[in-house]
């Protein structure tokens, strides 16, 4: 496994590197207008078809109603990059399931769905509730939950493709995809369809704001790195303190 692949396996590590200045420098492209509804989405991006089932459309509308424009575009790029990685790795996956998990993977960073749990859990809970309300099977709902909850952990990369490719796609959008899997021309097509809209700056601010309001939202992921750098008086809990205070003599 090369260094870039390892970074993509953990979005937490990936974002830490991104903050240090690592990132894909794509050539300038003329951006297409951002879609206002699912009906305005392109049919395909970089050879990847965007699912247009009723459930996929409903998931997109849920995300579009909660995300800021830059975060919605990130969610869409996550799906395309994840699907491209899956195709390059010859993995079989259910497109609709992966799409929904990718589109909703950052709900926990929105004012509508943020809370005191780690942001990835907040988002996973919201997505599962949405799916159950739409009559989706418990198995599929749990798969989406896992994809969202594990997208910031290397554990997710060892799960089935509908789960692992969420983190792969998100990681690719943070530090850039493996060129062997996603050539520069395809990256340009993705950025043209879904512009970054000052993603680095906006994402860091959003994460810092969420942790300011909900300190536990940082968990032990890249969110803690952001909190330690950008959130005043942030003092995360330490495992050693809990162990030392345990009710045992030794």
Give names to the regions the model predicted:
Residues 1, 21-51:
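C-terminal segment of N-terminal export signals and the immediately downstream linker at the start
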Residues 11-12, 35-36, 41-43, 66-72, ...:
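Divalent metal-dependent phosphate-bond-processing catalytic cores, especially two-metal-ion Mg2+/Mn2+ enzymes
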Residues 63-69, 109-115, 211:
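A short glycine/serine-rich beta->alpha loop
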Residues 96-113, 123, 147-152:
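His-Asp-centered metal-binding catalytic motifs of divalent-metal-dependent phosphohydrolases/nucleases
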Residues 74, 94-97, 135-147:
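Acidic/histidine metal-binding catalytic segments
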Residues 118-133:
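An active-site-proximal "capping" alpha-helix that borders the catalytic cofactor pocket
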Residues 88-96, 112-119, 138:
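Alpha-helix boundary/capping segments in eukaryotic regulatory proteins
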Residues 1-14:
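N-terminal secretory signal peptides and thylakoid transit peptides that target proteins
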């Amino acid at each position: 496994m090369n260094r870039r692949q390892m970074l993509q396996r953990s979005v937490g590590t990936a974002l830490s590197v991104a903050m240090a200045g690592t990132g894909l420098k794509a050539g300038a492209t003329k951006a297409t207008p951002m879609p206002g509804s699912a009906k305005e989405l392109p049919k395909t991006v970089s050879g990847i078809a965007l699912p247009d089932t009723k459930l996929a459309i409903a998931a997109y509308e849920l995300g579009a109603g909660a995300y800021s424009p830059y975060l919605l575009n990130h969610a869409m790029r996550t799906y395309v990059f994840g699907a491209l990685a899956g195709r390059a790795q010859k993995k079989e996956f259910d497109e609709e399931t992966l799409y929904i998990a990718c589109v909703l993977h950052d709900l926990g960073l929105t004012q509508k769905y943020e809370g005191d749990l780690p942001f990835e859990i907040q988002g996973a809970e919201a997505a599962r509730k949405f799916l159950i309300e739409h009559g989706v099977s418990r198995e599929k709902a749990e798969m989406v939950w896992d994809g969202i909850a594990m997208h910031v952990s290397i554990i997710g990369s060892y799960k089935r493709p509908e789960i692992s490719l969420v983190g792969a796609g998100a990681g690719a959008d943070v530090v850039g995809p493996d060129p062997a899997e996603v050539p520069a021309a395809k990256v340009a097509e993705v950025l043209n369809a879904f512009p970054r809209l000052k993603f680095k700056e906006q994402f860091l601010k959003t994460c810092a704001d969420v942790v300011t309001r909900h300190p536990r939202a940082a968990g032990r992921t890249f969110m803690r790195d952001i909190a330690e750098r950008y959130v005043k008086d942030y003092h995360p809990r330490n495992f050693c303190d809990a162990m030392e205070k345990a009710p045992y003599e030794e």
